[in-house]
Each structure stands twice: as C-alpha cells, then as structure tokens.
C-alpha cells in the first residue's frame, strides 16, 4: 500500500486490493455452494441435514472469524504509523486467542450440540446427518482459526493476491474430497451429507500448510519473522484484540445467527422448505462475497490511512467503496431476478423444490440493496477501530426488529417468505443507523487529528 493523491489513484489502489479479496471470498463461499449442491444431489434429507449443521457452524465460524479479524485494522494502522516491529507480537497473540477458541468450540460441539439437535423440530435422520457433519468440521477447527489469523495478517499489508493464491490452491481439493466422502468414490466411505463436513475439516489444514509456505517464501511477508520463535503473551495486546474483536465478532454473530435462527424456524414448514431456503441462502451467501470484499478493502485502506493521520483520504476511500457496493448491488439484484430459474436448476431437478427456491430468490433481491449500504459502512468503522456501537445496533436491528417482523409475517399468506422480508427490514435499519454513526466517527477523528497537530 502507498499514499495516493488523486481519486483515480485511489480507485486503482482500491481495485488492486478489492479484486483478489473478492476472488478469495467467492472461492471460499463456493465451498458452501458445493457442499449444498452436492449434498442436494445425494438426497433432500442430506441437503436438510447440511442446512441444519451449517446453521450451527456458520454463525460460530463468522463470529469468531470476526473476532480474529481485529488484527487487520490493528496491523494496518501499525503499518500506516510505520511501527512494523509490533506486527509480529500482534500476530502471535492473535494465534494464542485462536487456539483457545478452537479448544472451547470443540468441547461445545461434543458436549452440548447433540442435546440441542435432539430437541429440534426435524427428523432423527436429518439431525443425525447434521451431527456427523459438525463432527467432521471439528477436525479442522484449530486450522480454520489459525488460517484466519494468517489471512488477516497478509491482507492487512495489502497483499491480498497472496490470500487469493492460497484459496485458489485449496478449494478444488475440497470439492474433490466432497466427491469422495459424500458419494463414496475412489474407495472412500459413502457418508452422504455428513461427508461434506469431513471434506471441509481436512481442507482447513491444507489452507494452513499453503499459508505457511507462502509466508516463508514471500520476501514481503518473511521479513516480519512470524515463524522465528514465539513472542511472549502480552495482556495489553490481548486486551486490544479482544476490545476490537468482541464487538466485531458480535456484530457478525448477530447477523449470521439470525439467518441460522430462521433456518431452524423453517423446520415448521417441512423438509422441502428448509432445503429451498438453504439453497437460496447459499446463493445469497455467494453474492455477499462482493459487498463483504468492499468492506474488507475499506477496513485495510481505512486503517492504513487512519494510522498515517490522513483522515481525508480514509473518507474518500469510503465514498469509493459506497459507489462500488451500490453498483454491485444493482448487478446482483438483476442476476437474481432474471436468472432465478437457471440458478434453482443447479440445486435440484424436483419441480416443486425448484419453484420454492425461485420464490426465495425474488425476496433475496432486497438483501442486495441493504448490503450495498451496510457493508461499506461496517468496513469503514472497523478501519477506524470503532466497533462497539455496531454490535448493539446489529442486535437491535436483527433480533428485536427483523426477527419479530419476519415471525409475524410468517403467519400471513407470505408463509416462510415472511421471514426473508423481516431479515431485509433488519438489514435496512442497521444500514440507516450506522450510516449516521460513521459520519460522527469521522468528525471525531478529524477533531482529534487537528488537536494532535496543534499540540505538536
């Protein structure tokens, strides 16, 4: 990364960082896409089981990844402030947190989750598939969190192409393992939907291996000496990471868990509806890679410029990100509307299920416009290290507004589609409130910068 002066130079740097991130996110989300489609091709029960299992793993995955992503703005600001020597200790303390979280999650999976599954309104077969799917994921949980830290370290330096290479190398391996474990090919056991969990868990370890190799072979990464001895546990650094990471993780948890809660509530409408909801939701997840990548890019660039005390440049990047996200939202909405029948055909050959998926995809258009406003704002706030309020707003918007609205509408003629209208309502409310917040934060940072200049 480097300082830019003109809007043209800023657009170029924005796209240089954004493009590899979006390719990475699309490739990562394709893992979920292939888990869903390949399980659906095995059976509707397998698809429903993966949907329930994913409803447990997805919010935990996203929330703890969000917590660990706290090192991205921390390192970006350190680089902007030319304090590179502090980067190694930040990464190491992030790894300590990652391993602790992995241990806790594995315990919860084996001690708590089975009991929850037995009390859910799904068949015993679907619950069993979900349980074995999660057991497979557990194989790779430590690796997943380690790779999250390493990815955040790499991205915070603006070297997003390296992360892209890591992902492009490993996801085809995941698809191959799905083919082996789900359908029992090449002498592997036929595990149905649960097999996708084991394939994903094993793939996470390959991600770590490739990450370590690239960090050790790339000069711009190797110079930080990440793997040259361990640094001491520093509670001040742990506190900083947690202080930013917990609100950030909660924000993501409240958003992803609301979708998981809706998946569980869909159980009242039957296995077919769960399968259709999960199929349409996986498409939305894939498309969400674009606004999410805008947010990640703004976190990196905003953090870098804020660390260098160039708030005007950080604000200009936010405007660029907003313009990009709105354009992307319009394109995604058009794709969902005009190609919904083709998209549904990827998931099933069952006409009734295909029709349900197409109906969900129409309502998914609302998500695209809400995310176009919300994601850039969240990315900018993370770059500014202002994340405490976002978690509160997320809880109110999603759980106290979005879910009740959706629940109420589900008893009308809208049925299960009412939940998706409720979800969209929550996203729009959060986008409105946080758009006000980001402007106030920028005003505060501007005053602080001026005061620092006067005192110096």
From Swiss-Prot:
Main location group: membrane
Annotated localization: Cell membrane
Ranges annotated as spanning the membrane: 13-34, 54-76, 95-117, 132-154, 161-183, 193-215, 244-266, 286-308, 321-343, 358-380, 387-409, 414-436
Domain of life: Bacteria
Keyword Ion transport: yes
Keyword tags: Antiport, Cell membrane, Ion transport, Membrane, Transmembrane, Transmembrane helix, Transport
GO BP terms: monoatomic ion transport
Molecular function terms from GO: antiporter activity; xenobiotic transmembrane transporter activity
Pfam families per UniProt: MatE
InterPro entries: MATE_fam, MATE_MdtK, MdtK-like
GO cellular component assignments: plasma membrane
CDD domains referenced in this protein's UniProt entry, alphabetically: MATE_NorM_like
Topological category with respect to the lipid bilayer: Multi-pass membrane protein
Family: Belongs to the multi antimicrobial extrusion (MATE) (TC 2.A.66.1) family.
Job description of the protein: Multidrug efflux pump.
Record's protein name: Probable multidrug resistance protein NorM
Organism this protein belongs to: Listeria monocytogenes serotype 4b (strain F2365)
Highest classification ranks of the organism: Bacteria, Bacillati, Bacillota, Bacilli, Bacillales
Gene: norM
